[in-house]
Structure formats: C-alpha cells, structure tokens
Design a protein with these regions (language model features):
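Glycine-rich phosphate-binding loops of nucleotide-dependent enzymes
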Residues: 1-268
Length: 268
C-alpha cells in the first residue's frame, strides 16, 4: 500500500483548472519531487494534500485513510507536515522556541495540566526542551538555540524551518522549494541532510523544487506537471530525456540537470 495516494484529483478556481484528474502515489521511505513551470499546479497539489484546498473531484489517502475533508491540524496529527516556499518563522522568537511551536500537535497534556503547571506539565516541558535541542543539532543549528530567528542567516532560517517541521514527528514531509535562495553549496548540504533523515529517521519526502540539479541528484522519482496535468513521471534520468518535459521547460532547447529555474519561469 502506498504511503500517500491521490486519484483523479481536480481543482478549479472559477474558470481556471489548476489540477486536472491528476494521479499520484508515493511509497514509504522514498524521496519524490514534483516539478514543472510556474503555474503548473505544484503548490495547489501540496495544498490539497495538507487540507488547505478541497478538490472538486478525486480522492487522497494517507496510509489508507481518507485525507480530504480533514482540517490542516488533523492532517498534521496523521503524520503529514509541510514547509512553505516563503519562510514562515516567528522572527521575534528564538530558534528553539520556533521548534517548540512545532510540537503542539504531539503534546499529551490536558487543559488542567497546562493551567495548573503540575508535575506532569513540568516533566513534559523538560522533555520538549531536550527534544528541541536535539532537533536543532540534527539541523546543524546546535549553538543557535537562543538566537532570534530573524537574526539567523537565510540558509540557517531554512534549516530552522526543517527542524520545526520535524518537531511534529511526521512520517511524510512536504517541502515547497526548500533550496530557494540558497547557494549551490548550501543546497547540496541541505540535500545531504534530507537524505540522512530519510535513512536514519525513516522519513518520506515530497519536494517541489526548481533547482534541477537538486531534483536529479536527490529524487527516487520525479513527477512533472504542466498546466495542471501530469505529463511525465518516472526515474530522474528518464524524465530528463522525455520530450514532453523538454518542451514544457525549454521549448526545443536541450534541458540539462543544471538548467536554471529562470528557464522554467519564462514558460509560465
């Protein structure tokens, strides 16, 4: 059984069809990427998976359970978490406080525990802070816990978002352009971290990514959307050679793993 499965998902906004009968499956322990020119429907697909949008047609299941109709917080509790294209940290909170926010769906405390601050609450608070420090270390931010999020360099803010997402203990992590704004060196370092998380923490990852070099190097499978339709899917090397993908991105020009995101943007 696939970890995540979408069948014939369609989403419309007035007269615009953002997704047109799209099928998608993702197996546990894999890294998959969804690519396509701007406006192809990639983020809309993520928003369907996470309960922000409800499609007009189709089904989505996670571990065999229906996802559609659930609130975003309920979907997070199922084990699906995401990051966004634009950084959404709390800038006036410290790094570790941002991570602690991500644990809210996993805190086994009653209302009385919280307002009375009893022994159960104090023990849970200690465990949360210890786990938050551990996640910062995993993300390469071991000594940054007490720094305000707004004072961190851009690449470290991206890593902090990842640590906060991990705080919800997800089985599936959806990352919307995780390397946006990063140098190639920062992007390679982040991808190495993601690979390690998949291997060590048994995570499953689904990426939206414009950096084709990253997509080709890290993905087990690639799905290509164009104008809301799936035009290709398969191993990275096979997708790279698909004439429909080359046409969608670069017209008749040759597409290489180093092709820039700007080339895709010209098609949008």
């Amino acid at each position: 059984m696939p970890l995540l499965e979408a069948r014939a998902v369609s989403k419309r906004f007035g007269g615009l069809t953002a997704l047109n009968a799209v099928d998608f499956t993702l197996d546990e322990g894999h890294i998959a990427s969804i690519i396509g020119p701007n406006g192809a429907g990639k983020t809309t697909f993520f928003n369907v998976f996470t309960g922000i949008y409800v499609p007009e047609e189709g089904t989505v299941t996670f571990r065999g359970s229906p996802v559609l109709g659930r609130r975003p917080d309920e979907i997070t509790s199922l084990g699906i978490c995401r990051t966004f294209q634009n950084i959404r940290l709390f800038p006036r909170m410290t790094a570790i406080e941002n991570v602690l926010v991500g644990m809210h769906s996993r805190i086994p405390l009653s209302f009385w525990d919280v307002i009375s601050r009893n022994d159960r609450w104090r023990g849970q608070e200690r465990r949360q802070w210890d786990h938050g420090a551990e996640l910062l270390e995993v993300a390469g931010l071991r000594d940054k816990g007490n720094e305000l999020a707004r004072n961190l360099p851009y690449g470290e803010q991206r890593r902090l978002e990842l640590a906060r997402a991990l705080a919800s203990d997800p089985a599936l992590l959806l990352l919307d352009e995780p390397t946006a704004g990063m140098t190639q060196g920062e992007a390679r370092s982040l991808m190495a971290l993601l690979r390690r998380l998949v291997e060590e923490r048994k995570l499953t990852l689904l990426l939206i990514e414009h950096n084709m070099r990253v997509v080709m190097e890290v993905s087990d499978r690639v799905t290509v959307l164009d104008y809301g339709e799936k035009i290709a899917e398969g191993r990275p090397a096979d997708v790279q050679r698909d004439p429909r993908v080359i046409e969608a991105y670069l017209g008749r020009r040759r597409w290489t793993p180093g092709a820039s995101a700007a080339a895709g943007e010209r098609h949008a």
